[in-house]
Design a protein with these regions (language model features):
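Predominantly extracellular/lumenal beta-strand repeat domains
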Residues: 31, 51-55, 171-173
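Glycine- and small hydrophobic-rich membrane-insertion segments that are intrinsically disordered
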Residues: 2-51
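Surface-exposed, charged secondary-structure patches
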Residues: 115-173
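Short beta-strand edge/turn micro-motifs at domain boundaries
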Residues: 170-211
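Core segments of small alpha/beta cavity-forming domains
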Residues: 43-134
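Beta-strand-connecting loop/turn residues
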Residues: 7, 163, 187-189
Length: 212
């Protein structure tokens, strides 16, 4: 091969290599761009916030069932009523139990469930369910603003399990919202309380905190 042929071959190879490298870079950027878009879409799917306002808190199952949210046709409504039922339980265990059992549908509480609730509310911790109302803070002893307002929210993991919905409720005594899980009944589409993680520890009310 002559000198000029070698020079030509080298030039062609160099150009080809540069073009291939540029093409790979463009492909990588495109791939990353698509992946970023997919990740963003996944994160946004199912993200929703619903707010519920109550002029007063129900003291009996009949009062709970009289609320519009008692249709139980969305998991958000059932989650909101679960907080109200827990509040009622702190004042009247019998009434609160009736409410919770109704919200649980075909799976009423057993002895272990009742023992768990009683244990959570020991030592003056009856304020726990009230920490989920807007305006409740450690400084004001978790006293909600009026009307009683609850925010229920979902995220991209909420409907990972078919027939269930995991929602989250912001808490005035914790940095992150607390989860609650609902299950849908196939026969009528209504949503019922399945699991709740709303009674875990929160920051002590100021009047109970010796270090405040």
């Amino acid at each position: 091969m002559g000198f000029f042929d070698k020079l030509k071959s080298t030039a062609v190879n160099t150009v080809s290599s540069s073009v291939s490298s540029a093409a790979r870079q463009m492909t990588d950027k495109a791939r990353h761009g698509v992946q970023d878009a997919v990740n963003s879409a996944v994160k946004s799917v199912g993200t929703k916030r619903e707010s519920f306002k109550f002029s007063s808190l129900p003291q009996s199952l009949e009062e709970l069932q009289a609320l519009p949210e008692a249709s139980l046709d969305t998991p958000y409504k059932t989650a909101a009523l679960a907080v109200l039922a827990l509040c009622a339980y702190t004042a009247n265990r019998e009434a609160g139990t009736e409410m919770l059992n109704w919200l649980r549908g075909p799976r009423p509480m057993n002895g272990q469930d009742v023992s768990f609730l009683n244990d959570r509310f020991r030592d003056g911790k009856t304020y726990l369910p009230f920490t989920y109302f807007s305006g409740s803070t450690p400084d004001n002893g978790y006293t909600p603003t009026q009307p009683y307002t609850l925010v229920i929210q979902s995220d991209h993991t909420s409907n990972d399990e078919a027939g269930y919905m995991k929602l989250f409720i912001p808490c005035g005594g914790a940095d992150a919202p607390r989860p609650i899980k609902l299950r849908q009944r196939g026969s009528d589409g209504k949503w019922f309380l399945w699991e709740q993680y709303l009674l875990t520890g929160v920051q002590l009310p100021k009047e109970q905190d010796p270090w405040a």
